[in-house]
Amino acid sequence: MNIELRNICKNFEKQVVLQDVCFEDDINSIAIIGPSGGGKSTLLRIIGGLLLPSSGEMYIDGKQINFNEKELQIHRKNIGFVFQSKGLFEHLTAMENVMLPLIHTFGINKSEAIETANKLFSRFGLAQEKDKYPFQLSGGQQQRISIARAVAIKPELLLLDEPTSALDPEYTSEVLNMLGELQNDGLNTIIVTHEMGFAKNACEKVIFLVDNKIIESGNSAETFKSPKSEQLTSFLNKILVWKV
């Protein structure tokens, strides 16, 4: 999948959140990293069609995505979303959380929706949890079910906004292992993350976003090994100094 961003800007009233963001590359898996408040989540939501830019253009595989609601609805149906908060419906079981959107949003018949959900629960070691409600599940299980729900529609692109930031370390590993497996299957993913090990080792490419702009981007392993900008060098030194 090729994604091109041309001079994307986003302002909230007088606050500049993104300023002339330009990017073009073929992606399979890409991590967006950078300090808090740099515009990472805003950029992810614009790519997903959840938020309109103040100005700029976006192209997916050479086709311009016009920022009107009719086109954005079509665009969003090809994308799976996972956010920091797990977003499961508390009054529904895990099975219902995965199955019902397939039926009511995507028009899949009930038997096919159940079959799809069961396959995902079995694949990701969640079969024993499918009849439980969210309050009966660990944070890691809830987030993995959120990811299962997002990929149940067989999206062309999966967007994840800090999916592990609210999790304990052992649950973080569960979620990252699941994402690694999906990436190995060839699912296109863009993830906003503070997990530098995952960004370096599991994502093919990386974008470093700071002060509302993309400062650096490229191959993950090379970028982490030899950052070109002082900002990224300083950021990585601060992040990695306390790592085991």
Residue ranges and their predicted role:
Residues 110-128:
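Conserved ABC ATPase "signature" region
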Residues 158-161:
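Catalytic Walker B motif of ABC-type/P-loop ATPase nucleotide-binding domains
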Residues 48:
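Helix-to-loop junction immediately C-terminal to a conserved catalytic motif
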Residues 65-80, 184, 223-227:
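ABC ATPase NBD coupling module
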